[in-house]
Amino acid sequence: MRIENSIKNIASSLCSNIVTSLLGFISRTIFIYTLGKSYLGISALLQSVFGLLAISELGISTAIGFSLYKPLVEKNNKLISTLMTIYKKAYRVIATTILILGIILYKYLDFFVDPSQQPKEIFYIYFMYLTNIVIGYLLSYKTTLISSDQKGYKLIPLQIKLNIITILVQIGYLIIFKEYLGYLAIQIFSSILINIIQNRFITNEYSYLNFSSKDKLPIEEKRIIIKNILGLMATKLGDFCVNSTDNLIISKFVDLASVAIYSNYIMIRNLVNGYISILFSSITSSFGNLIAEGNEKKSLEIFDILFLLSFIIYSFEAVSFLCLFNPFIGDLWIGKEYLFPMHIVLAIVINNYLTGLRMPIIT
């Protein structure tokens, strides 16, 4: 069953990724030609700003997800209900924290980007982004349950349909109105709708669980979760410093146009890495399930295989990126004005390679 669920997760995720990445690429191209570097740059910058706020999540999602593996195997519904209730409460606290910090941080936005480079609608853009991330934390917690139960593939058809509709509507809006606020509003509405429908599906799928349990978590389970969160804090902080500070630094010390150019390289990198991460993320719950069964020897063997696989895949990817990044962007896609010199491209490739080698550890 474990292998079967992994295959289903990989196949469904791959199908979803192909469709959404193709449409997302088309949407990005139209975005660039209709709105230009300024809006592209501010979009990338705000994603990094809110990535900074997301550190407050502290790895709670991963820690709770790990704690769910064993009770799911043992069908301990009481413990599952208790964990999910704590998870819901924790994410409410995180959402409130991010909202407060986001409001405060807006006062210091000029520190990251010169006011002369900011779009005139920056106030509305900023708080629409903030609204989206806060609502996401309030509504998305149940997806960890179905992922830990190796049944994430059941959500993929719904996600594909809604993502296709969202991207097509956004493309149409950009072509007709050439305006950013409406584009963002469509994204927020879509995110809320997807989360509501997914929550309803998961609630029905696990109707035997109580998502508002009043039972207390066993002391030993508390210790395990706290230990995992403390261990994950360093990982979360490290991931942010490596992957989410680039746009902040570029915007502060160079300009918003360079952030826009950089974001195109990162988009391509993320599209390719999305296919690679499907392999690792789709087996995460299966690997956790294996650990929960106490098979340490088998777990170490699987880890060694994953580490070797990541080395081979990311080495090939690094060489490909180095050779193809600039020819693709400059000659085939959006023109040479969106290119970085090769020494910067090399830095992007090395950073991605080193991050990729950590994938089995993160898994």
Listing of model-derived features with the role each one plays in the protein:
Residues 42, 77-90, 261, 296-305:
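Membrane-interface alpha-helices at helix entry/exit sites of multi-pass transporters
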Residues 88-114, 128, 171-175, 300-356:
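Alpha-helical transmembrane segments of multi-pass membrane transport and lipid-handling proteins
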